[in-house]
Swiss-Prot record:
PANTHER family, alphabetized: OROTATE PHOSPHORIBOSYLTRANSFERASE (PTHR19278), URIDINE 5'-MONOPHOSPHATE SYNTHASE (PTHR19278:SF9)
Family: Belongs to the purine/pyrimidine phosphoribosyltransferase family. PyrE subfamily.
Function field: Catalyzes the transfer of a ribosyl phosphate group from 5-phosphoribose 1-diphosphate to orotate, leading to the formation of orotidine monophosphate (OMP).
Name the record gives this protein: Orotate phosphoribosyltransferase
Length: 209
């Protein structure tokens, strides 16, 4: 079993991901979605947490061997990033969604040196907007952002477009395609549900039609 399928299995088992193609969720954007993800709960399950953190470390070593600092996005990327930095004996920092409105007005908390090679940790990629904003902030502070590594992606076309336009490399430990395949295999969804989930990936607006 691949790492992607192992993580997909764990996310379903601990209910970090819910699939309801026949009774969809409503995202903050107003989009009706057959999937809901809360990867924060992975921190409460040591087996799942270890699988994810070890996966992060292996992936970073394979794709970004020159990394010098790990950064987490506030707030979901902070705990994972801190654990990864500890495992890799690397400095850690975190990136706020916007600068503080008091004190020194920092957006990056921690010490990042000019030109330091950074990998940013995120828990979930939908369109990628927030983590790309974080990457831009890190670049403005002088970091050399090598890429983003995340637990899971919905594989939305908008995300691919956004990362391509930003020139930022994205790697995820698991993904939507792997997840729905595992969900069908393990009986979480029906054939009809699988069909709807595939349609959502292709067209997030009209998938129910």
């Amino acid at each position: 079993m691949t790492l992607a399928s192992q993580i997909a299995t764990q996310l379903l088992d601990i209910k970090a991901i819910y699939l309801k193609p026949e009774d969809p969720f409503t995202w903050a954007s107003g989009i009706k979605s057959p999937i809901y993800t809360d990867n924060r709960v992975t921190l409460s399950y040591p087996k799942t947490r270890d699988l994810i953190e070890n996966g992060f470390v292996e992936t970073i070593r394979a794709h970004f061997p020159e990394v010098e600092v790990i950064a987490g996005t506030a707030t979901a990327g902070i705990p994972h990033g801190a654990i990864i930095a500890d495992k890799m004996t690397l400095p850690f920092a975190y990136i706020r969604s916007k600068p503080k409105d008091h004190g020194a007005g920092n957006q990056i908390e921690g010490r990042v040196l000019k030109g330091q090679k950074m990998v940013i940790i995120e828990d979930l990629i939908s369109t990628g907007g927030s983590v790309l904003d974080a990457a831009a902030a890190a670049s403005r502070e002088g970091a050399d952002v090598l890429g983003v590594v995340a637990i899971f992606t919905y594989e939305l076309p908008k995300a691919s477009q956004n990362f391509k336009e930003a020139g930022i490399k994205l790697i995820t430990l698991s993904n939507y395609t792997e997840l729905i395949a595992v969900a069908k295999l393990q009986g979480y969804i029906t054939n009809d549900g699988l069909h709807l989930l595939k349609k959502f990936k292709e067209d997030q607006v009209n998938w129910q039609q």
